[in-house]
Amino acid sequence: MIQIFFLGTGAGSPSKKRKLPAFLVRREGVNILLDCGEGTQYTLMNYKLGINSIKIIGISHMHGDHVFGLLGVIASMGLLDRKETLYILGPRKLKDFLYTSFEYSKFNPSFKIEFIDNYNDENITISTFKTCHTIESQGYLIMEKDRVKIDEEKLEKEKIRDWRVIRKLKEGKTVEYNGKLLKPEDYLVIKRGSKVAYTGDTMPCQSVVDSVKGVDILIHDSTFLDEPSAYTYGHSNVTDAAKIALEASVKLLALTHISPRYEDVSEHLKMARRIFPKSILPDDLSYITIK
């Protein structure tokens, strides 16, 4: 199960309704922060979302509305006596940006910071993909690994309740039970892992389509409603995001990075749903669970 908290869904500068981009992805003990706009530390702490429980931070690009909150988050981690390693993914200039800021502010983290290109453990993988913005930028793909589970309904139907037999089946072993050979492949089912994709800032981009095919949720740049100048600034219109979701056969589209010029966003959702019906436009502090 994956939970996604939409901490900030705005763009450029904060508005009364929308803070700057930040998304907290939780997956059974691994908390991932995607982008870190100004004020993210306040949101995390004010709503008790566990700032020190964040293990991995992924930054999409170096524009201020996506990265200016990172120093504050790391400083708060230090003040809270963090000991665990913090893993960071991001553009090439991110490391220099952070350590230069540490030097000028005389801040020395009490914990290890490790810059990585991807992440892999027994439960999830995190990889990046190319996006099309005005500066170096990347999106993120978080994938749960497939899990093998015992078919409990079939066990109950066949009245197999001996825990020793069930354990052997889980271990992939053939076992004899009441004169019958039980083969593990007949009692094990594969639960497909969930997939979450986040684009950061991007114009319509084939590399995005290719990278997010079939994901459970696509969180896509939807800065403008219908502005010809969107591409000049390296952004997408709502209809662009919907067309990409449709072409990539994603299960759910979340429109985000909404320009502060829009107070009423009802038309955004209408336009998106004409093309891709399974579209949502999350408010700040809303969340969604992917099972």
UniProtKB/Swiss-Prot annotation:
<keyword id="KW-0479">Metal-binding</keyword>
<dbReference type="GO" id="GO:0008270">
    <property type="term" value="F:zinc ion binding"/>
</dbReference>
<comment type="similarity">
    <text>Belongs to the RNase Z family.</text>
</comment>
<keyword id="KW-0540">Nuclease</keyword>
<feature type="binding site">
    <location>
        <position position="201"/>
    </location>
    <ligand>
        <name>Zn(2+) 1</name>
    </ligand>
</feature>
<feature type="active site" description="Proton acceptor">
    <location>
        <position position="65"/>
    </location>
</feature>
<comment type="subunit">
    <text>Homodimer.</text>
</comment>
<feature type="binding site">
    <location>
        <position position="61"/>
    </location>
    <ligand>
        <name>Zn(2+) 1</name>
    </ligand>
</feature>
<feature type="binding site">
    <location>
        <position position="257"/>
    </location>
    <ligand>
        <name>Zn(2+) 2</name>
    </ligand>
</feature>
<feature type="binding site">
    <location>
        <position position="63"/>
    </location>
    <ligand>
        <name>Zn(2+) 1</name>
    </ligand>
</feature>
<feature type="binding site">
    <location>
        <position position="201"/>
    </location>
    <ligand>
        <name>Zn(2+) 2</name>
    </ligand>
</feature>
<protein>
    <recommendedName>
        <fullName>Ribonuclease Z</fullName>
        <ecNumber>3.1.26.11</ecNumber>
    </recommendedName>
</protein>
<feature type="binding site">
    <location>
        <position position="65"/>
    </location>
    <ligand>
        <name>Zn(2+) 2</name>
    </ligand>
</feature>
<dbReference type="InterPro" id="IPR013471">
    <property type="entry name" value="RNase_Z/BN"/>
</dbReference>
<feature type="binding site">
    <location>
        <position position="133"/>
    </location>
    <ligand>
        <name>Zn(2+) 1</name>
    </ligand>
</feature>
<dbReference type="Pfam" id="PF12706">
    <property type="entry name" value="Lactamase_B_2"/>
</dbReference>
<keyword id="KW-0862">Zinc</keyword>
<keyword id="KW-0255">Endonuclease</keyword>
<dbReference type="InterPro" id="IPR001279">
    <property type="entry name" value="Metallo-B-lactamas"/>
</dbReference>
<dbReference type="Pfam" id="PF00753">
    <property type="entry name" value="Lactamase_B"/>
</dbReference>
<comment type="function">
    <text>Zinc phosphodiesterase, which displays some tRNA 3'-processing endonuclease activity. Probably involved in tRNA maturation, by removing a 3'-trailer from precursor tRNA.</text>
</comment>
<dbReference type="GO" id="GO:0042781">
    <property type="term" value="F:3'-tRNA processing endoribonuclease activity"/>
</dbReference>
<keyword id="KW-0819">tRNA processing</keyword>
<feature type="binding site">
    <location>
        <position position="66"/>
    </location>
    <ligand>
        <name>Zn(2+) 2</name>
    </ligand>
</feature>
<dbReference type="InterPro" id="IPR036866">
    <property type="entry name" value="RibonucZ/Hydroxyglut_hydro"/>
</dbReference>
<keyword id="KW-0378">Hydrolase</keyword>
